[in-house]
């Protein structure tokens, strides 16, 4: 388990964040996960599964469609990188920002209730890493992420079970957008 390799301070912060999400979830549906045990596996370990790729870049990162703050919050805590988390649902973005403020993480993580297309018009190619977990189809999320990446930036897509056709279409779109797949790995949690 990746979580167990982190230092104690980082583990405590990530667990505290997960506990806040589970509590907030009682009033605002941020996730379908309702227990710490499931959250540790399906949110924390899943979020941290790309930590090696995530730490290969410096500079700010962007989490598209952050929902309850996954994978952005665990990755920021684990890596120490600064980032922006966006979600088009304002209530979710406000809730995640409140939890980040409560844990005194607002110096490293900013949350915005905005769509990626709007953010791209506002800031352009700003982020060294763009990450998306369970957001839209692979071709669509590639088109959303590319305008936000600096040259030689990195896009990380955390996907569930993807059919072969969707992967082929994603590779076709990536090539059109001037992107290159560096690596792919399959995890079974």
Where are these regions (language model features)?
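Class I SAM-dependent transferase core
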Residues: 1-58, 62, 91, 98-107
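Residues at secondary-structure transition points
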Residues: 35, 71-73
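Ubiquitous "structural anchor" signal
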Residues: 37, 55, 77-80, 153
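Class I SAM-dependent methyltransferase "Motif I" SAM/SAH-binding loop
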Residues: 65-68
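S-adenosylmethionine
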Residues: 74, 81-84, 88-189
């Amino acid at each position: 388990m990746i979580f167990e390799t982190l230092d104690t301070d980082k583990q405590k912060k990530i667990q505290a964040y997960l506990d806040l999400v589970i509590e907030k979830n009682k009033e605002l549906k941020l996730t379908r996960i309702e227990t710490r045990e499931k959250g540790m596996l399906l949110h924390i370990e899943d979020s941290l599964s790309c930590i090696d790729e995530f730490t290969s870049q410096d500079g700010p990162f962007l989490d598209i469609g952050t929902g309850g703050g996954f994978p952005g919050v665990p990755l920021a805590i684990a890596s120490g990188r600064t980032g922006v988390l966006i979600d088009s649902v304002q209530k979710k973005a406000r809730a995640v920002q409140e939890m980040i403020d409560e844990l005194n993480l607002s110096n490293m993580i900013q949350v915005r209730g905005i769509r990626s297309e709007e953010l791209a018009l506002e800031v352009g190619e700003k982020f060294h890493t763009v990450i998306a977990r369970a957001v839209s189809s692979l071709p669509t999320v590639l088109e959303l992420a590319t305008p936000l990446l600096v040259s030689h930036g990195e896009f990380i897509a955390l996907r569930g079970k993807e059919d072969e056709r969707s992967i082929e279409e994603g590779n076709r779109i990536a090539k059109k957008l001037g992107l290159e797949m560096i690596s792919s790995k399959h995890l079974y949690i």
